[in-house]
């Protein structure tokens, strides 16, 4: 198995380094990751400036000023040859649950892999301590994929409780929950009296029902949520069509 490994916390983050070490015990791994923390970068691509890379002695590649999506794009299309069999993103420091997936660079890296035609996993730890647990879970899932490929055409978003491995209760297939909207913008002043702003913390849980990713992780289970790239709200298409007709929206602009 040839694995392209990326993240959004940066190439030196403990999550990606722990996971790379574990994956290399049974797979060929190429790390291509941002040279710094790019959390919250979502699916952004660098289009107006060229991208430079730095190669470490162990073969890891950092993309300077690159986003997670940049890294996977370059990894698949230029930097890993032969091409990878699968894209893995993580281990993220902190969860990517519910609405987090909209903003997550970790999920975006996996989404880019899927967009480029490859199976893809995004892995996050619900905390900042037991990266070895998340690495063991990821390796177990990847070995299962080797034995029996999963042909869903979807991204697997995996969230792991921040617990010792022997305290993990199992794995649940879940749906994304949701949070209340985040509404805080924290204002400060720089030494010259200019106002600057920090984006506030995420909103509190809104939908954390028993079948959600929030509930699974809170109860000590690994959450596995299948995500897809198609954002079309298929169930709403007829409603929108009927509204356009009843509202008499015409081509007479």
From Swiss-Prot:
Pfam families: SurE (PF01975). Its EC number is 3.1.3.5, 3.1.3.6, 3.6.1.11. This is 5'/3'-nucleotidase SurE. Gene3D superfamilies: Survival protein SurE-like phosphatase/nucleotidase. It catalyses: a ribonucleoside 5'-phosphate + H2O = a ribonucleoside + phosphate; a ribonucleoside 3'-phosphate + H2O = a ribonucleoside + phosphate; [phosphate](n) + H2O = [phosphate](n-1) + phosphate + H(+). Its cofactor is a divalent metal cation. HAMAP family: SurE. It is an enzyme of class 3 (hydrolase). Binds 1 divalent metal cation per subunit. A divalent metal cation binds at residues 8-9, 39, 92.
């Amino acid at each position: 198995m040839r694995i392209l490994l990326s993240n959004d916390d940066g190439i030196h983050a403990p999550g990606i380094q722990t996971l790379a070490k574990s994956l290399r015990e049974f797979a060929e791994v190429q790390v291509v990751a941002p040279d710094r923390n790019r959390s919250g970068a979502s699916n952004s691509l660098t289009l107006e400036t060229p991208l430079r890379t730095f190669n470490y002695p162990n073969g890891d590649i950092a993309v300077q000023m690159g986003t997670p999506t940049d890294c996977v794009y370059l990894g698949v299309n230029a930097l890993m040859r032969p091409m990878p069999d699968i894209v893995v993103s993580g281990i993220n420091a902190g969860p990517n649950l519910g609405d987090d997936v909209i903003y997550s660079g970790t999920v975006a890296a996996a989404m880019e892999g899927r967009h480029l035609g490859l199976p893809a996993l995004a892995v996050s730890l619900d905390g900042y301590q037991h990266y070895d647990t998340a690495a063991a879970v990821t390796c177990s899932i990847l070995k299962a994929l080797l034995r029996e490929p999963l042909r869903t055409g979807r991204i697997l978003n995996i969230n792991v409780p921040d617990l010792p491995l022997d305290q993990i209760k199992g794995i649940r297939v879940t749906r994304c929950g949701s949070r209340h909207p985040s509404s805080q913008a924290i204002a400060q002043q720089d030494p010259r009296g200019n106002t600057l702003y920090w984006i506030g913390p995420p909103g509190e849980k809104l939908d954390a029902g028993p079948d959600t990713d929030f509930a699974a992780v809170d109860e000590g289970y690994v959450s596995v949520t299948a995500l897809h790239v198609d954002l079309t709200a298929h169930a709403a298409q007829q409603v929108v069509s009927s509204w356009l007709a009843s509202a008499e929206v015409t081509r007479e602009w």
